[in-house]
């Protein structure tokens, strides 16, 4: 269980932001309008409320900041020393102390100015006292800028610290830089620590978790330690020293016997002896890493004696230390190191709990009661003989049913045929006699019955299923298939020749016209200026060729084109008669015609969008069919347009001062509008 959650500490604002937060809150939460005509008591209350509220806001905000940060005397020594190493305990305490002093000074300031405000005799004097009190409070907070900035940096770093439980089962990895601590941790856990071929890749503590005997174990990877005095060690190394000093865990001291880390075995052994005091009263394992590069038997004799001295109390080592070879590359020995370390720590923790006074207080309450025999007489359970006999008979019946074979009709027939044979009388059952079955084979030659064949199925083998004329049958099938394909080809030729010459020419003309229409459609889609359909002129040549393709006579074609031209002239919408046209060219319209044209002009004014009559080649029979197609097209686009989203071309003028944010009632109830 993790004891501390530093991520809950709220953000510490800068001094300027602090002042803005408090003053804006005071402006929002207190009345803002006062007049000199009001009674002096009301004026004093108005300004005293502002001073009180500002001081209270400062007090609450500072109290929350001071309370969120942990007190070094109240937390676990491991975290207290870690904060001291990372942030300097003196600087940390001074910053919190300055905020506490500022809080007390603000409280005293508010008391002094409230006392003066009680005797204010005018609005101007009360306002100046309020202004002076708030100004002194803000000046006081401006001076706390460096402390607030430092505490915000501490908060950010504390939130990024790993969640280490100092009281749980822990494996602690230590040793020189680049000896394989992070690689070993990645093998044990899923922490995914960064591994690089240079020293001091790990610059802080990393935590992973693994399972052993249905329990969760905490694995801590510490930065590398160098062999020099304590006061010369930097912040990175001091994190490892802090973890070794305060966490009760099983320590795994890793030694690179291949010396590829850049340090000799003698230097690594010297480091062990220099920090030996941190290993006392803790389970200890010395892990000989990188045996894939150099086997333990290849280590020089002098270096091997130095390694063995780590577990020899006579030569300054620690008794009970285990020496285990291991390789992170080949994973040789990793499971053994894990099992040994967890088992040693588990036994040590159990033994420690049994020695505690709490166990002694509780263990006398446990009592194991065992019955004692009153005499030497054997009192076995009494089971009636009938029950025993029935159980035996049931077992025999079950066994006989299990051994009884299931016989088919052919087997029964075989038994009946050989029932009088001597072998059957001797106990040889014919259904299990292979030769008895071979006698029943149906073969052309009886000598073949006892041949050794790979498979027997109801008295037949593979040769019985092979047709001797198989090649001849294959040739017949191929000839039949060729005849079928030839017949299909002839049928296709017959279908193609169903049309006579005139129809074939018409079919070719239709195909050519389709191709021409397709090309014209592609040309229309090209990016060239186009005229609207309502103002486009009539192409008489195209219309004449179209009518000719529909087998119209030349006289009919001329009449149709003239009628269409006259009709299109009469359908020009909204076009006024030009000034140059003489009134004598056309007869004066009658009153009925004038009324009809007036009604038509009104109806045309109402319709904002009109559909032009279908042009030749559009594929519409008449205007009604085109209108119906246009309506279906709009209906199909409606659902797609509903899913439209705002794009770069859309423009929107925002309301920069929305009224619902800049007007409204006040909490005091003095105004209906701001």
Swiss-Prot record:
GO CC annotation: nucleolus
Provenance organism: Dictyostelium discoideum (Social amoeba)
An individual GO BP term: rRNA processing
Protein name: Probable nucleolar GTP-binding protein 1
Domain OBG-type G: start-end pairs: 169-346
Keyword Ribosomal protein in record: no
Biased composition (Basic and acidic residues): 518-527, 619-633, 641-653
Keyword field: GTP-binding, Nucleotide-binding, Nucleus, Ribosome biogenesis
rRNA processing keyword on record: no
Function: Involved in the biogenesis of the 60S ribosomal subunit.
Top-rank lineage group of the source organism: Eukaryota
Protein family per UniProt: Belongs to the TRAFAC class OBG-HflX-like GTPase superfamily. OBG GTPase family. NOG subfamily.
InterPro entries assigned: G_OBG (IPR031167), GTP-bd (IPR006073), NOG1 (IPR024926), NOG1_N (IPR041623), NOG1_Rossman_fold_dom (IPR010674), NOG_C (IPR012973), P-loop_NTPase (IPR027417)
List of residues binding GTP: 175-182, 221-225, 289-292
Residue segments, region Disordered: 518-538, 564-674
Location within or outside the cell: Nucleus, Nucleolus
GO molecular function, one term: GTPase activity
Compositional bias annotation for Basic residues: 570-580
């Amino acid at each position: 269980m993790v004891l501390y959650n530093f991520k809950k500490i709220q953000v510490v604002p800068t001094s300027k932001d602090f002042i803005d937060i408090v003053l804006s809150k005071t402006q929002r939460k207190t009345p803002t309008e006062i007049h000199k005509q009001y009674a002096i008591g009301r004026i004093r209350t108005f300004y005293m409320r502002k001073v009180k509220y500002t001081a209270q806001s400062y007090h609450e905000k500072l109290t929350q900041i001071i309370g969120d940060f942990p007190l070094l005397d109240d937390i676990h020594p491991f975290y207290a020393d870690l904060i001291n190493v990372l942030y300097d305990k003196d600087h940390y305490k001074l910053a919190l102390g300055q905020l506490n002093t500022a809080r007390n000074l603000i409280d005293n300031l508010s008391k002094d100015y409230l006392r003066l405000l009680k005797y204010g005799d005018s609005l101007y004097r009360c306002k100046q006292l309020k202004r002076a009190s708030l100004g002194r409070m803000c000046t006081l907070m401006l001076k706390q800028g460096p402390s607030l900035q430092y505490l915000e940096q501490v908060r950010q770093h504390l939130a990024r610290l790993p969640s280490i439980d100092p009281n749980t089962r822990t494996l602690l990895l230590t040793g020189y830089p680049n000896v394989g601590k992070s690689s070993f941790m990645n093998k044990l856990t899923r922490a995914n620590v960064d591994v690089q071929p240079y020293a001091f890749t790990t610059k802080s503590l990393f935590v992973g978790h693994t399972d052993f005997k249905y329990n969760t174990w905490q694995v801590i990877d510490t930065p590398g330690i160098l062999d020099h005095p304590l006061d010369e060690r930097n912040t990175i190394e001091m994190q490892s020293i802090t973890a070794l000093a305060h966490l009760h865990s099983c320590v795994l001291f890793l030694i690179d016997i291949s010396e590829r880390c850049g340090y000799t075995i003698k230097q690594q052994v010297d480091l062990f002896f220099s920090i030996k005091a941190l290993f006392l009263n803790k389970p200890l394992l010395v892990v000989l890493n990188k045996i894939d590069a150099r086997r333990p038997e290849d280590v020089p004799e002098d270096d091997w004696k130095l390694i063995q001295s780590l577990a020899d109390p006579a030569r300054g080592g620690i008794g009970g230390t285990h020496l285990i070879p291991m390789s992170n590359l080949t994973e040789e020995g990793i499971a053994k190191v894990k099992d040994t370390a967890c088992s040693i720590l588990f036994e040590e923790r159990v033994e420690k709990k049994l020695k505690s006074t709490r166990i002694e207080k509780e263990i006398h309450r446990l009592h194991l009661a065992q019955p004692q025999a009153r005499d030497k007489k054997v009192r076995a359970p009494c089971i009636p003989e009938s029950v025993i006999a029935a159980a035996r008979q049931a077992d025999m019946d079950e066994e006989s049913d299990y051994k009884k074979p299931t016989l088919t009709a052919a087997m029964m027939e075989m038994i009946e045929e050989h029932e009088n044979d001597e072998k059957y009388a001797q106990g040889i059952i014919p259904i299990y006699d292979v030769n008895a079955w071979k006698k029943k084979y149906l073969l052309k030659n009886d000598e073949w019955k006892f041949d050794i064949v790979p498979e027997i199925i109801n008295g037949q083998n593979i040769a019985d299923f092979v047709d001797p004329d198989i090649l001849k049958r294959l040739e017949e099938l191929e000839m039949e298939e060729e005849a079928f394909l030839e017949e299909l080809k002839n049928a296709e030729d017959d279908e193609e020749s169903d049309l006579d010459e005139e129809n074939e020419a018409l079919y070719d003309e239709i195909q050519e016209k389709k191709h021409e229409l397709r090309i014209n459609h592609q040309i229309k889609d090209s990016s060239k200026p186009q005229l609207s359909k309502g103002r486009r002129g009539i192409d008489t040549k195209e219309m004449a060729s179209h009518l000719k393709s529909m087998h119209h006579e030349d006289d009919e074609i001329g009449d149709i084109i003239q009628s269409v031209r006259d009709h299109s002239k009469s359908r020009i919408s909204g076009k006024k008669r030009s000034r140059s046209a003489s009134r004598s060219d056309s007869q004066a319209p009658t009153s009925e015609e004038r009324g009809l044209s007036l009604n038509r002009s009104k109806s045309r004014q109402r319709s904002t969008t009109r559909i032009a009559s279908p042009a030749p080649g559009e594929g519409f029979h008449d205007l009604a069919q085109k209108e119906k197609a246009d309506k279906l097209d709009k209906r199909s686009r409606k659902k797609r347009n509903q899913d439209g989203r705002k794009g770069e071309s859309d423009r929107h003028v925002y309301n920069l001062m929305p009224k619902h944010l800049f007007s409204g009632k006040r909490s005091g109830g003095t105004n209906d509008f701001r």
